[in-house]
């Protein structure tokens, strides 16, 4: 990947995060730092206490879906720790949905989406945004952001308070 493009993406994430904060929109983004030194070289901030959703599926011994993972790691539905993690999930899902819509980010597979130890999702790898496409194929995704049935299930369905909060954000 071209780290210069990743650096630009990180700067845009920081700008969008500042705009949301100034507008008092409680959507959450993690603007991690990248310093490109050359086309393929540079320094990227490590994002602590995270795992990709893809790695969860492949490496977690009893992984069935995200909702059950949340219950295993944050407590049963209704507990304070679970509800806090779910709120973090909703605010970060909203933040990255806004970001992906504005920047036209594509290639949002589960290897590019991290989950942290507080329930936030964090998107990484911004090789495909605006009309930039390393393989010159930018028409492969039509959705403006990633919202899966599994993400909706973590929010307790489309009729839930959490999903309504996501829509409001």
PLM segments and residue spans:
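Conserved ATP-binding subdomain of kinase catalytic cores across diverse folds
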Residues: 1-105, 117-133, 138-139
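Short, surface-exposed polybasic-aromatic patches that bind anionic ligands, especially phosphate groups
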Residues: 108
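Hydrophobic residue at the +6 position relative to the catalytic HRD Asp in the kinase catalytic loop
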Residues: 111-115
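Long, cytosolic, alpha-helical-rich C-terminal regions that act as interaction/scaffolding modules
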Residues: 126-169
């Amino acid at each position: 990947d071209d780290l210069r493009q990743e650096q630009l993406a990180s700067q845009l994430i920081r700008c969008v995060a500042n705009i949301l904060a100034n507008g008092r929109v409680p959507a959450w983004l993690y603007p991690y730092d990248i310093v490109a030194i050359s086309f393929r070289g540079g320094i990227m901030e490590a994002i602590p206490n995270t795992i990709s959703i893809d790695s969860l599926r492949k490496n977690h011994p009893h992984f069935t879906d995200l909702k059950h993972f949340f219950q295993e790691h944050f407590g049963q539905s209704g507990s304070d720790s679970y509800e806090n993690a779910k709120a973090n999930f909703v605010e970060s899902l909203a933040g990255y949905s806004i970001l992906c819509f504005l920047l036209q980010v594509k290639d949002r597979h589960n290897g590019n989406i991290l989950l942290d130890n507080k329930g936030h999702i964090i998107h990484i790898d911004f090789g495909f945004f605006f009309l930039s496409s390393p393989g010159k194929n930018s028409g492969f995704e039509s959705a403006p952001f990633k919202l899966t049935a599994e993400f909706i299930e973590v929010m307790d369905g489309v009729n839930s308070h959490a999903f309504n909060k996501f829509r409001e954000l």
